[in-house]
């Protein structure tokens, strides 16, 4: 895929975020700025917030119910894409909720619009990203209470991906999640037994910051490492038909050229080992 370089204005990215979220409006622009530094694509960011103070089932359902009106508000500014940045609100209801929410918001975004608007949900994005990596089994770290993490686990497994390990940080206060030290995630990841995992979801929550350590964790562990934020950016770039070229954000967002170089390096290393043997 190549960027549509003939575009004369920046891509307008609309974001729907929980009212207590302090992370996605930081991490999504940061990742896309790295994309811009490589290919010159330009983005502007426009957000609306839905009330969520504590992560609880009734609050998550209320968010989902209000998401359609939030889409309308964003589309008034003629955005090119809408990102619904609340993974748990969508995954809480299982696979059916993931599918229904994505379809419902896409219909709302494109009802009587002059130009098509693509819709990305963080839940759909994470599932699609894992499938693109060929991950059949994963481990993940989530900020939620165990019963909520179990819902996310069940939804991922409904999509045909086995969750080998799911670490719950047991934090109910969403603002507190946004203050977590990313270096803590690095330490936690290194303590996991990943022998039977094809990938690690370092942050299975849009509020838990992680992008500054994604690459470091991936290099230490030797398997793909992603987050709700990196998966959301990957899906957004797919919708806009832009090849991901985001540096220092893990395998998922590297360019096809970087992938080819990595494969060539691995092949050469294996050849050297055979020669030495």
Give residue spans per PLM region:
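C-terminal functional extensions of proteins
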Residues: 227-260, 272-277
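A short, acidic, amphipathic alpha-helical segment used as a generic capping/interface helix at domain edges
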Residues: 68-72, 181-193, 209-214
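Glycine/small-residue-rich loop that forms an oxyanion/phosphate-binding "nest" at active or ligand-binding sites
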Residues: 67, 71-119
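Periplasmic-binding protein-like
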Residues: 14-16, 79-85, 139-140, 197-205
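Hydrophobic structural segments
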Residues: 11, 41, 118-135, 189, ...
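Active-site/ligand-binding-proximal alpha/beta "capping" segment
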Residues: 191-195, 200-201, 208-224
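Conserved beta-alpha
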Residues: 101-172
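N-terminal glycine-rich anion-binding loop in soluble enzyme alpha/beta folds
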Residues: 1-69, 144-181
